[in-house]
Amino acid sequence: MEQNIISTIRDECIRHRSKYLTIAQLTAIAEAKINEFIITGKAKDQDLSSLLDKCIDILSIYKKNSKDIKNIISCKNKGAMISSNSVMIIQLNYVYYKVIHIIVTTNIPHLSEFAKIKLHKSTSDEGNGNNNNNEFQLMNIYNTLLETLLKDENIAKIKSFIKSSIKQTKLNHEQEECNLMRTGSYITSNQLNSLISSSANSASSQMEILLIDIRSRLEFNKSHIDTKNIICLEPISFKMSYSDHDLEKKSLITSPNSEIKMFQSRNLFKFIILYTDANEYNVKQQSVLLDILVNHSFEKPISDDFTKIFILESGFPGWLKSNYGRQVSSSFPSNNNIKDDSVYINGNTSGLSLQHLPKMSPSIRHSMDDSMKEMLVAPTPLNHLQQQQQQQSDNDHVLKRSSSFKKLFSNYTSPNPKNSNSNLYSISSLSISSSPSPLPLHSPDPVKGNSLPINYPETPHLWKNSETDFMTNQREQLNHNSFAHIAPINTKAITSPSRTATPKLQRFPQTISMNLNMNSNGHSSATSTIQPSCLSLSNNDSLDHTDVTPTSSHNYDLDFAVGLENLGNSCYMNCIIQCILGTHELTQIFLDDSYAKHININSKLGSKGILAKYFARLVHMMYKEQVDGSKKISISPIKFKLACGSVNSLFKTASQQDCQEFCQFLLDGLHEDLNQCGSNPPLKELSQEAEARREKLSLRIASSIEWERFLTTDFSVIVDLFQGQYASRLKCKVCSHTSTTYQPFTVLSIPIPKKNSRNNITIEDCFREFTKCENLEVDEQWLCPHCEKRQPSTKQLTITRLPRNLIVHLKRFDNLLNKNNDFVIYPFLLDLTPFWANDFDGVFPPGVNDDELPIRGQIPPFKYELYGVACHFGTLYGGHYTAYVKKGLKKGWLYFDDTKYKPVKNKADAINSNAYVLFYHRVYGV
């Protein structure tokens, strides 16, 4: 059989003129061999025992070859050349696996003998001697084979090897064609895509490819080809008399530093690709630019032997119409025509974001180009001039969304530290790479997105007549020194410490606002007020970013402790700040100021960076006092509170508020300020057809798709660190019709059940109460769309995504504002695995395969370690907030009471009856 298959593979390789056959071609060979050796064979070869024997024989050969394959793949990953014999072994093993897989999953289940055995097994209560023993043995062998297939790790490596090899062969062929072309030639979208892909995977020391977009900055911001090395050179910014020196010093004067640096290295790139749109003037300027680069590059001559300059055939419009048209930064030009629900109907995933969330917090890796996919690097002062005008005139500016599942997750790396190659939604994990390479997680410059610091210089009006020399002259007269007062933001960031290498996650429901008009002696007073003169930001406090320069790599002590002054009933704010600063990942990005790179002033619900900026100032003040001070001190958070009041009037006065509500406000506000998709249009409601199809899916799959839809409008470090999701399902008790909605959350509010006199209440009881199936009252009955009238119905909540940091609010106040003071027992180590939706049934939407949905950290178990407790004493009308926060092994647990803080002698004190908001961090290996 082996020689027969080898001969067939060789014949197919010759026929297709390729060293490698595709997965589909190898599968076809496997199917043909099954027909040849089994189906058309003797009758005895078709009984269950014979088929199982054949599978066992083939499996033994497969296992034997797998040892060699590990070495082959290891050598390939190290860059070694792979021999033809090695390639044949890999392809042969794939056929072996596929033969076994088809026999076990397709042929055997269709045997009448197999059906009878299954029937006997399910209906028989007692054994019937040898026959039943024989049937039992056959079923055992079958189940063992099936389990072996499902748990086999080698097939994923084989598939990855074959796919990557075919892709690389194609890329090499395309690049060879480009190497033979002369400067000034036109290249196709296929060739450009090959160059981009080859550049991303290249180990060469030479920089591969630079794209120059010759359109207006406004059009560039809206949408451009998605690649790492790309600059925008506006058509109006240069003329025929320019040299390469003029381009650098004049045309790029308002460009970001990152683009200027790329252009300065233009002679080091292997390929430079020019492209524009169909505008006649732009096409003319494209030719002018080509002439400048080829014939007037005096400062850095470009040699055709080292650097080739090509023009993209059909320009940007042609790229959009090609198969790679969705590979653009910002939203797709055709995005408005894509229904948000198309993934449920026909598997069209192009309307989803499918961003690759980082393994750590976004923006805290050494290079932004390799960190969070949609995060933006900091702009330089000079690009503010033009970008502010563009943003003011383009309120619909949309950040980029990525392409389909198939492109982004073919190399998706699971964040699970234990099983980096598993896919929760894959039955057999056959399609996951064994050693996937990181995705090209571009961190576009501000010109690619819309994240900018606040407080720009006054923007002069730019003339619209692009063909006049006046504009060029004005550009030449711009004085770089006039912008010198704006400090550039360093594009480098540092790695955030994390309690553990945890996955990442997601978002929030709105909660009912409660004004807790409390007073406290010495703590908070309802009568104490802030002087009116203090209730506005002075001119000196205007929001500029001149002092927000991301710090170079610094080993911060993230467990610093500083008290906070009570500004008159502001203990609700103080306790939450102390707890949130126990989240190391969040504290880090505000200490090193890498958050500033991601402020999105166009976010529709954001504060233009006000909240994020003043929160950062507060963190810096606290850290500085802790580091510089020789004794316990406290600081006044007055400016931060004023900033909160300017965003939400609820926090403007000196009245007491609910600390849980402030926690929700703060995290939501930071999210919107840093939301990279905050200017995207809202999601459309699902059509009835799409909703009906979604209801047929498991919660596991439907919630994952809904999460991807959610990320198209909400994508920030807060999502990564704090946000989760739950499903709310209504069910008609008459016809069993269901309707499910998926709600993101930042703070999860859970009810406290009625106390059983014999037992204490545990937090697990609260989660059971939160997720129990509830019979709706008569006046709350659901209007069932199937029955077309109100029917007896039920409602049930199910947690579908658990975040990296879980904030739990114990709902102590009822609808009448009475407080429940029952002691809820919560552990230091909390296991929420039983409350997580784990109902995957193998069903996907049409067109979506089992290896295409990102896991996003949703791999059980879900265990959490307590690190913060916000406590509330008293009643609705008089009370006080304090906090317990874990400050590492050295300092242990500290108790914060406004300005005062002290070590906790017994950490068990953190478990107390006054707990109101709990902060948990996900941990592994416990």
Curated annotation (Swiss-Prot):
Gene Ontology biological process terms in this record: ATP export; endocytosis; free ubiquitin chain depolymerization; intralumenal vesicle formation; protein deubiquitination; regulation of DNA replication; ubiquitin recycling; ubiquitin-dependent protein catabolic process
GO cellular component, one term: proteasome complex
CDD domains for this protein: Peptidase_C19R
Subcellular location, record wording: Cytoplasm; Late endosome membrane
Job description of the protein: Ubiquitin thioesterase that acts at the late endosome/prevacuolar compartment to recover ubiquitin from ubiquitinated membrane proteins en route to the vacuole. Also removes ubiquitin from soluble proteins targeted to proteasomes. Is essential to maintain a normal level of free ubiquitin. Involved in the ammonium-induced down-regulation of the GAP1 permease and the UME3 destruction in response to oxidative stress. Has a role in the RAD9 checkpoint response to TOP1 poisons. Required for promoting coordination of DNA replication and avoids DNA overreplication.
Note: Present with 428 molecules/cell in log phase SD medium.
Protein name as it appears in the record: Ubiquitin carboxyl-terminal hydrolase 4
Lineage: Eukaryota, Fungi, Dikarya, Ascomycota, Saccharomycotina
Gene (name only): DOA4
